[in-house]
Amino acid sequence: MKSLSEIDTTSKRASRASGFSWGIAEEVGKNIRLLELFGLPGIKNLTQYYLDRKSKKYENLKIINQKNISNTLAFCPIIAGVSFLDQSKKIENYTKLIFENLAYPILFLPFLSRSSEIMGKKISLSFDENEFLLNLNVNILVNKNDNQILPLAKKLEVKILENEDSFNDEEWKNLYALSEETFVEETDSLKQSGAGAGLTDND
């Protein structure tokens, strides 16, 4: 089994050989390491994308808008991802973004995962029948993982999610009430045994 360090280094070198700057190659190395760590097919998709680049051209998306459409060449997922990451603070003000004709969308994922951490917000991404939830670069939840090479997303939707509790007010009140049961009235016997001390008791 290849180590994450090997995956990072080899992906970085392959990226440089494919024509990207060392700076972008460094980002790709981190990204493929992240994908493989989360059990997603980073190596497969990166390898096939770089093989395709030998005979195909891709459009570089430098400015991220709410609608990003290419009617000719497919967008390069790496340049689009770098642009998304660099513009994270602007993008967090959007609620939804559309990308049409994006090549190898799996390679776009880790850029959004890292952007999620910068924004402090979860990001959802969907295309075809694939759905991903990017959780502050801590994990990536997937509705299915066929370990496949996905060469193109004709229409990809990104949503910036507002932070919300996963519980309602009533559930919180019930838990808080349970937590208060730890504070029992002190008696002489409890004092002697050390029980019943409050949270501010430093003895």
Question: Which positions does each model-derived feature cover?
Answer:
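Long hydrophobic alpha-helices with heptad-repeat/coiled-coil character
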Residues: 1, 90-94, 104-115, 183-202
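A glycine-rich, acidic short-motif signal
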Residues: 43, 48-139
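Glycine-centered secondary-structure boundary/capping sites
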Residues: 1, 19-20, 39, 120, ...
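Extended, charged low-complexity segments
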Residues: 143-203
